[in-house]
Amino acid sequence: MYPNWGRYGGSSHYPPPPVPPPPPPVALPEASPGPGYSSSTAPAAPSSSGFMSFREQHLAQLQQLQQMHQKQMQCVLQPHHLPPPPLPPPPVMPGGGYGDWQPPPPPMPPPPGPALSYQKQQQYKHQMIHHQRDGPPGLVPMELESPPESPPVPPGSYMPPSQSYMPPPQPPPSYYPPSSAQPYLPPAQPGPSKPQLPPPPSIPSGNKTAIQQEPLESGAKNKTAEQKQAAPEPDPSTMTPQEQQQYWYRQHLLSLQQRTKVHLPGHKKGLVTAKDVPEPIKEEAPGPAASQVAEPLAAEKPPLPPPNEEAPPPLSPEEPQSEDSEDSEDSEEDARFKQLKAIAAHWQAAAAHWQQQQQQRVGFQYQGIMQRHTQLQQILQQYQQVIQHSPHIQTMSLDVQLRHYEMQQQQFQHLFQDWEREFQLWEEQLHSYPHKDQLQEYEKQWKTWQGHMKATQTYLQEKVNSFQTVKSQYLGNMAMPPPFVPYSQMPPPLPTMPPPVLPPSLPPPVMPPALPTSIPPPGMPPPVMPPSLPTSVPPPGMPPSLSSGPPPVLPPPALSSAGSPPVLPPPALPGGPPILPLPPLSSATPPPGIPPPGAPQGMPPQLTAPLPPASGSQNSQIPEKPRQALLPTPVSFGSTPPSPYHPPPQSEQVNSKPLNKVFSSEQGLGESSALSQSIIAAKDTPVKSGGLLADPPKGSFLEGPRGPREQKEQLQKLKDFGSEPQMADHLPPPDSRLQNPSRPGMYPPPGSYRPPPPMGKPPGSIVRPSAPPARSSIPMTRPPVPIPPPPPPPPPPPPPPPVIKSKTSSVKQERWDEDSFFGLWDTNDDQGLNSEFKRDTATIPSAPVLPPPPVHSSIPPPGPMPMGMPPMSKPPPVQHTVDYGHGRDMPTNKVEQIPYGERITLRPDPLPERSTFDADHAGQRDRYDRDRDREPYFDRPSNITDHRDFKRDRETHRDRDRDRVLDYERDRFDRERRPRDDRNQSYRDKKDHSSSRRGGFDRPSYDRKSDRPPYEGPPMFGGERRTYPEERMPLPAPALGHQPPPVPRVEKKPESKNVDDILKPPGRESRPERIVVIMRGLPGSGKTHVAKLIRDKEVEFGGPAPRVLSLDDYFIAEVEKEEKDPDSGKKVKKKVMEYEYEADMEETYRTSMFKTFKKTLDDGFFPFIILDAINDRVRHFDQFWSAAKTKGFEVYLAEMSADNQTCGKRNIHGRKLKEINKMAEHWEVAPRHMMRLDIRSLLQDAAIEEVEMEDFDANIEDQKEEKKDAEEEESELGYIPKSKWEMDTSEAKLDKLDGLRTGTKRKRDWEAIASRMEDYLQLPDDYETRASEPGKKRVRWADLEEKKDADRKRAIGFVVGQTDWEKITDESGHLAERALNRTKYI
């Protein structure tokens, strides 16, 4: 984290040396881009260069800022008036409003500021604050007084250069009255004083703004702090993170004090300068002025740990702010100061907590980063396999080559999506890693690869597009022929981009081509250009990689940074006004690519500016990009439209400077919301989409494709659900916010409504339609406040942004959300920005367009966001407003307790605002505005990145719970406010995990658009949030719901099953296939009886007899007993099986039974097993339960209950009552998780049967008595030995009983023989009909049997197998008689 700050030069300039007077901007090279840029540049330069001393950096920055502000005051004062009345006509205004600055009323111009980009506004505020703090009172006043210059800056070119300062000036031009500070407050104070007044609903929004700004300030401070830390002196770098934090905090306090002193003099010195700003702010919203002061201070203050620093910084900012307020004027200032103090205290507490949580996170972060390294390497290995060309591919036919490249592109798209997703996750993790400076080599390596991957994507897209174009030209009837249309409709075609793509290795080249493409259409071409850009930027729905080459191309542009984006801005410039701003830009800072203001009215500047960023950004941004992406993403949301313009210049500056510079500038932007946001928007978008390419696309990409992007967004919107997921994984996170707007079906695709703005409709109205929906999720809560401020804007939902940019803010935010989201998500930041820019251009007349994005931008429409979110692997880096709680890593409970605002521990202002939000709709709205402001802050400051990272870490652990709780709260508020939130929530969840991530917040966003917008603002977090929100979304209710259940569970009775449901139909049809019933009960309670009943019932209904394992069987022994033989009357010893209980053997037997039980389970022969044992102790049957469960059996516990006395009488094993009582006293209750079997119905059935049996008992007894009598009579006749042949009454037995056969063997005389023969030959009367019975022997006569057989066969008429006709036809019986002579051998 600290390295990150260092990287962001911006933070370094913020540190201790804030006192330096405001000499002309000289020191920083980056100052050249423009005053605004100088401020941003100053930070960047220090960080980028050999870390100038903070004091030197401050001095240089202050000088530059002063110069810039002076120019701005001159220009803004005049243009300011112009802009409000004539939106497009006043060039200055246009410049300032860039299409949004000029919005209808002065408020509109302010909205332009916001429209410019909430980030820019914030940046502007930061600049103002910095100047004020640093002693550039003039600077602030300048911003306020000289919006004209600001307008020039807004042209998109200048602003970006000023990164943060210029953007603020921009807003001033349009809404100078509000105050330069107000620009920072984009949402609350987008418009001039008038707008500010509209924001008054926002002014609470104003207060909120102040508060929000404070968070923003803290964010800026964090960034500043980060810059200070990273860029600062070697000492901090050598310190441990905690030491650094303490060191930076001390430095911050020191610098804040110095700045306060300087500030006061500055205000006194230049009432026009510093004081001017405060006054306007105070007039419109004293809060803003204070906010401004606090913001810069805050930006400065949070040097080290975003959370910690943030907490302390707010206090310092508050002090300066209060001083400023007092100097400026207003008791309101004092009130705000107190508020800020409270917030600062809260932040300090949060910071302390954050510090504690920080180190634990670092270990996990490092592991996560290493895992990402491994996954990225695996993807690269796959990439090596995919990107292989046949050496003779050039010689092959057009069709073959086209198919080859299409197939390769298709394969690469999936790979690229995986890469983007993993890279963004890696980037997020890296940026959240406090010691990322130790991983710079890794970062360079992966960013180089990121550029290479994007270049490949662009290259393949270009190849496919070129072949398709050629083929379509030949075929003439190809749908592809119109590249623009295809581009807008299909991400694959990116003819425009091809040039950039052509240098696959060089993403920047790709970017520049995009620029030219964009450049061609200054105002008209924009639509075409956007298509090409969109081509590079696949529709949100389509993953960048999916969208053929273009998306990839866009990513490279992202690397190139502003290369492509600038192009897009030109489209936005369609209105002349944007161009006007350009001149100021060039005057302020004729950045590398930005032509003089005279250039194509903003188009050249944009193009130029973007182009340099493209190349520079590409290189420097790749390493840094991740970080930027994290921070910028929110910013870009906040100020996508403006950001696109400024980002390019900023990118240029960044490009000119090393990545560090870019980051530093970005941080500068972070400090000055506007610029940071723009950079973030530009960079972040790429990062999100491309991971490394965030910076370049930032402005240009988002802007470039605006026109086509609108179309594309529509197409992508359609595709979003299908293809976006892939892309969502990589790009969506950053772009998700931009994309989400278009993504959600809820709002027309950004392109959908956007195209009209380019046509000339005010983007506000056109964009707004979509924006309001998207925003509605966010602003809904806040709409009241914002809505009043922006009467002009038809879409009041965005009003929260309107705080500063009333309608414009709304529109712009919406559009910005869409664009930023879209662009970010798309990886073609151009597209998002471009469409936004287009809208801005179209909206130039209506400032509203620009304003919407600034604050709310950071919170893109929740709906769209989801789509973008998935791509955002970095989502976590993005510090989503939703993550307010995440930052502090508070326990879930704590999170629940903490209101939305409080949740955002890391952000100074958020807590109070959030609380307000919780408090009521209006409050929520205000909070929403603040959040928006804050969001941009978070977006812009690198610190925010840290916050996001830390938050992400926390999110990973605590965030889930907290998110659930918070989300639940949000959902609850949303539901109360408007049911729509839930739908949004689910919509986002369904739509995108990323959005879902943000989902928790996003859902609320829908409801409380104002609240959530900030959250959406940071896409990175959104991405991460996406993940959590999903959890959150589902969990929110559960979080509350689940907690109670645990208690009830404990009280809840064990689950029970009725035995009839298992044994009787229809229950037995659906019962488990394998069942084990464990009987337990006292001896004599009827266990064995019930086991038999169960067995019998199972058999009764057709089941196999269950296996009954009874412990009693083990106690049955063979015993010899003397019994009296009934026959002989003698005493005979017989072996009998009897039950003999041996307590010593019980355990042994139980073990043996367990083995048998396991064997039975393993055999699987018995699907129904019954265990019959006392089982008075749980340990006796627990192992049986576990073993059965392991084998997939459903185990039921059948507990017998009976009175001890009854058991003593009934038990057949002779157990004494004393034993039974003792057993009952020590009876153990079965575990609750074991299913009980209710056997009462079985016993009832048995009882009924017994009753029936009793009815028949009388008869049965009578029958028994009769039998006994018969037996007695029989025995009286004499003893008759029984044989097995005499089992029942048979003739033989009767003959014997009759004495006919008694002495057969003794009579050997012939008479006896003869008599016997006669008797023997005498046929029984029933011989013919007698049937043989099994087990019984009877006499048969062969001839008679033969005759019977013949008769039977004759009746049948044939014999199966072989028919013996002789036998059948023999009626005389001669054949049968022969049978008597047959000899049968046995």
From Swiss-Prot:
Basic and acidic residues bias: start-end ranges? 276-285, 706-722, 904-938, 945-1014, 1023-1033, 1049-1068
Q: Which gene encodes it?
A: Ylpm1
Disordered: where is this region?
Answer: 1-336, 517-1068
Q: Does the keyword ATP-binding apply?
A: no
Q: What is this protein called?
A: YLP motif-containing protein 1
One Pfam family named in its UniProt record: AAA_33
Natural source organism? Mus musculus
What subcellular compartments does it reside in?
A: Nucleus; Nucleus speckle
Comp. bias regions, Pro residues = 14-27, 81-93, 102-114, 148-158, 166-176, 184-203, 302-317, 517-558, 566-603, 641-650, 746-761, 781-803, 848-878
- Which InterPro entries did the record assign? P-loop_NTPase (IPR027417), YLP_motif_con_p1 (IPR026314)
State where the record puts the cross-link Glycyl lysine isopeptide (Lys-Gly) (interchain with G-Cter in SUMO2).
Answer: 894, 951
User: Which GO cellular component does the record give, naming just one?
Assistant: nucleus
Keyword terms, alphabetized: Isopeptide bond, Methylation, Nucleus, Repressor, Transcription, Transcription regulation, Ubl conjugation
- Top-level lineage group: Eukaryota
Any single GO BP term: regulation of telomere maintenance
Q: Which residues carry this modification: N6-methyllysine?
A: 683
Q: Where is the composition biased (Polar residues)?
A: 237-259, 651-667
In this chain, composition skew of type Low complexity spans 31-50, 59-80, 762-779
Span list, region Involved in interaction with PPP1CA: 1336-1343
This chain's function reads: Plays a role in the reduction of telomerase activity during differentiation of embryonic stem cells by binding to the core promoter of TERT and controlling its down-regulation.
* Record's keyword annotation contains Ubl conjugation: yes
Bias kind Acidic residues: ranges: 320-333
Against PANTHER family, the record matches this protein to:
YLP MOTIF CONTAINING PROTEIN NUCLEAR PROTEIN ZAP (PTHR13413), YLP MOTIF-CONTAINING PROTEIN 1 (PTHR13413:SF0)
